[in-house]
Amino acid sequence: MVWRNGRRAELVTNAAQYARGYDPATGKELWRLAKKSEVTIPMPVVGPDLVYITSGNRPIQPIFAVRPGVTGDISLQASEEHNAHIAWSKMRGGPYMTTPIAYGEYLYVCSNAGILTCYAADTGKEVYKERLGGVSYTASPLAADGRLYFTSEQGEVRVVKAGPQFELLAVNELGDVCMATPAISGRTLFVRSQHFLFALGRKQPAE
């Protein structure tokens, strides 16, 4: 993922043991962050001022908020929760499969079991933690027009209002297994299930 921040462009990778930032023009390593996590699936996530690195492999399930323009080994020491390079961190709560969403002033993290945690994006303060419903989540969520979309493996698309208070707006039942991350084009949400491709949106009036 290329992060174009106010200082430079950084190619950010999230891998086992380390996350790294590279100069995309030369491939030179700019920084590295020890995560102490053997398995990493989620992508890095860009917010307004920080990039978020997560992993949900037990026993360590970290979330790191990395500042732009850092250089060298930016790893936290054993007793640290932040340093000059990392704005904040959590050693529990990182997702195993799903990539979080940085949307507006908040970072939203959904666990495999459907526990949605909302953090203040700049400080890491927990704003709320709520159960979405559904059994399991593999697909990463999406955000658009002030709404968050979470697709369970059981084929239920849950729509949550973005913001500091949890509000479930709708549940759309598709009736088929869903594991792929949906995509948004225009005002249509496309969801690929095991047997079908769904296009969800408002029906346009006939001309």
What is each model feature region?
Residues M1-E207:
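Noncatalytic, solvent-exposed loop/strand surfaces
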